[in-house]
């Protein structure tokens, strides 16, 4: 079932790029409402669960291996699953509970009143020739404009910057390696996007298999962001409202993982 859903939505993504809007397959009761409030839960690596407006969106479920070896499998209930690629550290959809809809192709989508944009960004520093393209996801939920960059490795170009605008919340890879931004590249992307809040992702933690993980810890990124406020949560989840975000400048938010 998961494979059929994934393939169906792959085709739909190509259609919506040409201007066709997907009809929602979710219950009308899940439609986005004007009232705000968003829960952001970190499930390890680049995997997050976003809950707001009665909708649960899971991004980048993974298989525990390599840099994610010590994390628990993120098998959580969701209404919609977004994946940045079909690599095991950000696109493992087998075994997810329930029957969520799955999107993985770039394009414009409308699901239960929420408009989502999948934006293609190279997954390596070779124009995608090694690892193909990564899909960054842009949407509004709970009154928050969210950009999840997945495993982006190429700079944000002018066309992408115009399409994205200024996000409220950016989730950005910072640990480097061959498939995603290193700390300096992440800093440049943050500068280009000027988000209100930055949540670093894709960095080395104690979950890593030391013999099979090439990414670095988050501290290197934080050092480069000298002068920017850093908040550290004592849990893996935060609740956000638009009023919590700075009007000027950016703040870095770190979440904790309970190993």
Regions found by a protein language model. Give the residues of each.
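Metallo-beta-lactamase
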Residues: 26-27, 33-35, 90-135, 139-142, ...
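Active-site-proximal loop/helix segments of hydrolase catalytic cores
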Residues: 125-193
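N-terminal export signals
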Residues: 3-27
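Active-site-proximal beta-strand elements of phosphoester/diester hydrolases
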Residues: 39-42, 56-62, 115-122, 138, ...
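C-terminal segment of N-terminal export signals and the immediately downstream linker at the start
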Residues: 22-51
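Pre-active-site segment of Zn-dependent metallo-hydrolases
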Residues: 47-106, 117-134, 152-163
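Binuclear metal-ion centers of metallo-dependent hydrolases, dominated by the metallo-beta-lactamase
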Residues: 115, 131, 197-259
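Conserved acidic residues
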Residues: 77-79, 168, 196
């Amino acid at each position: 079932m998961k494979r059929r859903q994934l393939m169906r939505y792959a085709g739909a993504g190509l259609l919506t790029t040409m201007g066709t809007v997907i009809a929602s397959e979710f219950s009308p009761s899940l439609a986005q409402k004007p009232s705000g409030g968003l829960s952001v839960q970190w499930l390890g690596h680049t995997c997050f669960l976003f809950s707001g407006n009665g909708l649960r969106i899971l991004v980048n479920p993974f298989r525990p291996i390599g840099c994610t070896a010590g994390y628990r499998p993120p098998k959580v209930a969701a209404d919609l699953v977004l994946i940045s690629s079909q690599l095991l550290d950000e696109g493992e959809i087998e075994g997810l509970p329930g029957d969520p809809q799955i999107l993985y192709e770039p394009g414009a989508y409308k699901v239960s009143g929420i408009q989502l944009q999948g934006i293609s960004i190279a997954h390596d520093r070779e124009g995608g020739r090694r690892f193909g393209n990564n899909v960054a996801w842009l949407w509004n939920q709970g009154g928050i404009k969210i950009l999840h960059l997945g495993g982006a490795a190429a700079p944000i170009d002018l066309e992408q910057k115009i399409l994205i605008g200024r996000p409220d919340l950016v989730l950005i890879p910072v640990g480097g390696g061959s498939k995603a931004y290193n700390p300096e590249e992440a800093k440049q992307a943050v500068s280009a996007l000027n988000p209100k809040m930055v949540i670093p992702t894709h960095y080395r933690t104690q979950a890593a298999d030391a013999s099979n993980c090439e990414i670095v810890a988050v501290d290197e990124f934080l050092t480069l962001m000298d002068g920017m406020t850093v908040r550290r949560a004592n849990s893996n989840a935060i609740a956000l409202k638009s009023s919590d975000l700075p009007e000027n400048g950016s703040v870095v938010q770190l979440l904790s993982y309970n190993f």
